């Protein structure tokens, strides 16, 4: 594949999903920070949801960093345009500083701030920074900020932190080959990140900063603060920050329905996404990696090149045995990402449509870790897949290629959701009224689910795979999420958190979107009365029990029954002989902790009662 390269051009102005962010003069200026006592505020939008104590008691809302769970009225205020969305706050800051960015002379250096874009290939922000430095004849300096508080607040899994640090080692080597330093700065207090970046830029004599936009609430607000902070000061002290769209193939908010609103359903959004790319082929043009720094950069910035990659912060470290296992399973860096992409497109993408739901087969790309860490851009992935299609189209030709592209596009869709419905980042379901469901907080049930000891073989196999590898097949994510939320009626947000704390590919938008779908509380959900039957799912997607045997040691000796239906391995206590049951009990394999039919009825009743409440 030899994708076309982008030529130098001026970065487009950042647009906002709703047009002019300052146009609505009626908007309230209240923030999301509540008073110490949530029941004493005169602002009704600051009152917490009536069930807020449950979310705090069970670790869903981290009060160390965030306010109480907001009321449904506050979530609705975002929908009614009464509260500014964080994207609007950042867009306003960029608009206010646009003239400065255009006119400010380059001083001694240009900085690129790496975040979740840990690659040289097809990195728009890095390319723009490189072009700026090249035009001015000054060095490009790269920066990564390690914030232990952010890792804690965002529930970053130790396995993912380890992958990120290993990727930084690869990135540092690749940059050094170009004479570009990578400075890694640890900032203990997350709120001090903008100030520390400004201090570093001042010490380097840098005038311009480039970084990719992240769409979660914390990051949008942080970058809005940074943009304004860098623009402050006397004439010779001002700095410019360009926060550019790059994470998604199509910028969130760019696609609007016929009525001018934002899409809340994937299918029409995806059709609009396809149409937009076809009409704007530059969406899939690939950015070149940066050129080398000017001669003498290494001598001038010797201290920056001497920077080492730190170890993981306390609480985010792996044991030595985990490191050995995970490093073998998950090689880090963009070279591995591109190699895996090419291998998948060469060997498996053509059969993706028919194999993608079978966890015992190598039918998927296993690229989610690279999308999450930014070692591979969605643009490169989709461009590569499209170019392998005999039609050279996104939605025509090989069915496997079409299906895979549509699955990668879900990633864009869920980030689009974060931008327009920001309260989903704040422990609220997409449909606020679903907050009124009374969930169970049965600790024994939740623990059995996390440890793969529910007595439902397909559930237990999937959860044990996570504990062993930090990864789970997407079909299984849907099955285990539905089981937790509906069979056990445990608050889906506890499962959402558990996934983020254990998955190597934990991405907030995709994880939140997936849980919203499975628990029927999110955007484009399955109706709440549709409840996955774990037995039927097991028979359909692991018919011979190969996946279950791999991960549930207690069931490996059960006889194989090709074709799945009736096989003991799917329901050993319900279908096994007395001898089989006795052997399972001796091995310690648990009986089912709930009866599916009764659990389904309980879930439907809880959903009906919750949705009938007006809280």
From Swiss-Prot:
> Residues annotated as region Disordered?
1-53
Q: Where is the composition biased (Low complexity)?
A: 31-40
Q: Which terms are listed as keywords in the entry?
A: Chromophore, DNA damage, DNA repair, DNA-binding, FAD, Flavoprotein, Lyase, Nucleotide-binding
Q: How is the cofactor bound?
A: Binds 1 FAD per subunit. Binds 1 5,10-methenyltetrahydrofolate (MTHF) non-covalently per subunit.
Q: Does the keyword Nucleotide-binding apply?
A: yes
Signal peptide limits: none
UniProt key word Chloroplast: no
Domain Photolyase/cryptochrome alpha/beta: from-to ranges: 108-249
GO terms under cellular component: cytoplasm; nucleus
Q: Tell me the GO molecular function terms.
A: deoxyribodipyrimidine photo-lyase activity; DNA binding; FAD binding
Which reactions are catalysed by this chain?
Answer: cyclobutadipyrimidine (in DNA) = 2 pyrimidine residues (in DNA)
Enumerate the cofactors the protein uses: FAD; (6R)-5,10-methylene-5,6,7,8-tetrahydrofolate
Q: Which processes are annotated in GO (biological process)? A: circadian regulation of gene expression; DNA repair; entrainment of circadian clock by photoperiod
Site positions (Electron transfer via tryptophanyl radical) are 439, 492, 515
Binding residues for DNA: 356, 537
State the oligomer form and interacting partners: Monomer.
Q: What is this protein called?
A: Deoxyribodipyrimidine photo-lyase
Q: Which organism is it from?
A: Neurospora crassa (strain ATCC 24698 / 74-OR23-1A / CBS 708.71 / DSM 1257 / FGSC 987)
Gene that this sequence comes from = phr
